[in-house]
């Protein structure tokens, strides 16, 4: 009573196929498969980029901007 037999699952499958149709189920399966593949590729790309050491960037003094700070007065 607690678990479903193979016959229960077959009946559910037939009802789902009658309600949605095989073409709609196939499209849903393709969309889901594409999403899973994209997720796996994204995870693999993230691991590859994380494994490479970060290239050190050289900062030059000419990129420094010299400005005078202004005081702000608080109005209440």
From Swiss-Prot:
The family assignment reads: Belongs to the TatA/E family.
Q: Where is this region: Disordered?
A: 41-76
Regarding the membrane, this protein is recorded as:
Single-pass membrane protein
Q: What Pfam families does this protein map onto?
A: TatA_B_E
Q: Give its localization.
A: Cell inner membrane
Q: What are the protein's UniProt keywords?
A: Cell inner membrane, Cell membrane, Membrane, Protein transport, Translocation, Transmembrane, Transmembrane helix, Transport
Q: Name one GO cellular component term.
A: TAT protein transport complex
Q: Where do the TM regions start and end?
A: 1-21
Bias-annotated ranges (Basic and acidic residues):
41-50, 57-76
The entry's protein name is: Sec-independent protein translocase protein TatA
Please give a single GO biological process term from the UniProt record: protein transport by the Tat complex
List the InterPro entries.
Answer: TatA/B/E, TatA/E
Q: Name one GO molecular function term.
A: protein transmembrane transporter activity
Q: What is the lineage of its organism?
A: Bacteria, Pseudomonadati, Pseudomonadota, Betaproteobacteria, Burkholderiales
Q: How does it assemble?
A: The Tat system comprises two distinct complexes: a TatABC complex, containing multiple copies of TatA, TatB and TatC subunits, and a separate TatA complex, containing only TatA subunits. Substrates initially bind to the TatABC complex, which probably triggers association of the separate TatA complex to form the active translocon.
């Amino acid at each position: 009573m607690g678990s479903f037999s193979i016959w229960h699952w077959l009946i559910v499958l037939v009802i789902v196929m009658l309600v949605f149709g095989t073409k709609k189920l196939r499209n849903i399966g393709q969309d889901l498969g594409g999403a899973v593949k994209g997720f796996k590729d994204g995870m693999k790309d993230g691991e590859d980029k994380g494994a490479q050491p970060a290239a050190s960037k050289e900062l030059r003094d000419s990129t420094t901007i010299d400005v005078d700070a202004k005081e702000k007065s608080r109005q209440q």
